[in-house]
Amino acid sequence: MPEVQPSALPKPAPRLGRDAAVASICGFVVALMVGASFAAVPFYDWFCRTTGFNGTTQVAGSAPSSEPLARKVSVRFDSNINGLPWKFEPEQREVEVAIGQVVTVYYSVTNTSKRATTGQAAYNVTPLTVGSYFTKINCFCFTEQTLAAGETREMPVVFYVDPAFAADNENDTVKNITLSYTFYPVREPPPKPLASGEPDQRKGNL
């Protein structure tokens, strides 16, 4: 049997090169996963708004072109606070509306603390299948709300239930709809500029 010369054997790849390649691949995969996670947030929000998935309501700039239908449903209003020193409640707990009828209701919110605070409302509709038909024309939930210490504000919600709701067989037994809001804190307001010569209370004694 002929003897294999050492020079004929395959040489192992340099370990340093292999480690660098593996590290590069791992870094690329991690970056891809992080990027995908950030992209998923706006995509999920867009998907919910477009389809009404998870009870997300729709947005319209005007009333429906068709006349309201004879069929009516009861719309209940729910309010919640998470992490804010606010009192938040609907001025009406329930209204009966015709399908396609534009309705305006009000929520009242009061900042019970001694400082300005900012919040924004998240919302959904139940049953979840109604989300794609529950349409808002105007809502305080579209923007952040900043309340001064002790301030009370009345905030309107203008909405209608799309007439297509009645054509969907899944809604044949739906008689009650609940619109729910939860206010969450957004950020601390920036400190007010001090007048000339006014001591800065945020600093300790020097």
UniProtKB/Swiss-Prot annotation:
Q: Where in the cell is it found?
A: Cell inner membrane
The reply on keyword Transcription is: no
Record topology, Cytoplasmic segments: 1-17
Species source reads: Rhodopseudomonas palustris (strain BisB5)
- Taxonomic lineage: Bacteria, Pseudomonadati, Pseudomonadota, Alphaproteobacteria, Hyphomicrobiales
Ordered alphabetically, the record's keywords are: Cell inner membrane, Cell membrane, Copper, Membrane, Signal-anchor, Transmembrane, Transmembrane helix
- Cellular-component GO terms for this entry: plasma membrane
Membrane-spanning parts:
18-40
Chief location of this protein within or outside the cell = membrane
Q: Name one GO molecular function term.
A: copper ion binding
Assigned protein family? Belongs to the COX11/CtaG family.
Q: Which biological processes are named by the entry's GO terms?
A: respiratory chain complex IV assembly
Q: Which residues lie on this side of the membrane: Periplasmic?
A: 41-206
Q: What does the function comment of this entry state?
A: Exerts its effect at some terminal stage of cytochrome c oxidase synthesis, probably by being involved in the insertion of the copper B into subunit I.
- What kind of membrane protein is this, topologically? Single-pass type II membrane protein
Identification of the protein by name? Cytochrome c oxidase assembly protein CtaG
Q: Which residues form a coiled coil?
A: none
